[in-house]
Amino acid sequence: FVDGEAFQYNLGSWFVYPLFLVCIINVLFRKFLKLIHLDNEFIVLIVYLAIGMIGINTAIENPTAINGIVKLLVRTMFFLPCYEFGRFYKAVLEKKDTLNNVAYFAIIFAVQLTLLTFCKDLEYTPSSFTKFNNGFIIPYISSITAIAFWLSVSRFLVPAIGNSKLVRLIADNTYGIMVNQLVGFMCLKFVFYGLSRITSGALFGDFNVASFKSSIWYYYLPNGLQQWAFLYLIFGLFVPILISIILNKICHIAHSSIFKKV
């Protein structure tokens, strides 16, 4: 619970624990604001942003201290404003979001271009809570522009693929995909490993068995071809979906059996 990393196959579930705490904190904080008659989205946003920035600054100033319970704490602090961004958009900004697409994309690209020009490296890693090389404000600005970009892209795609069964299948199983994506990748690696052993190396003879057994981050690409990464994407999507479908059926059967007895 503290690390959020559990078994290596479930490394993708690291976000569950801080998000769980964020939900609890959010409910309690909003109840407190109602008691003092200050239940306002702007206040919540400002407070959560301040908390998130303190969390990032803690990681910047004390990188060696980010482990154990401290890691869970700063992850939770970082998530608070991210969680509020969604609520704030829904409650305040969505009805005012009427800017035409040209102006919308122009602003996003202008902000991103400015960040890319004047900042060292925009990449940061919230799972390990590292690589905050541009202070405690830039990570949130870059995140907001990225979210705004994909929000606009999704609006373009909805008329074309909004009712697609495949898209809905993926959209309805995003939690399972996030949690079990590494299981999907490992399944594909097991296929490569199995074929290599069965054919005595005639197929995928350069598969590194030692790396496969020792590191979950070993990804075998036949002949080093990056195009094989697409197959990892397929396994990373549909193996978790299959797991989710099976688990849902088991839960449904168990739930029905229990209530029949009652």
Feature locations, PLM:
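Alpha-helical transmembrane segments and their immediate juxtamembrane cytosolic regions
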Residues: F1-V262
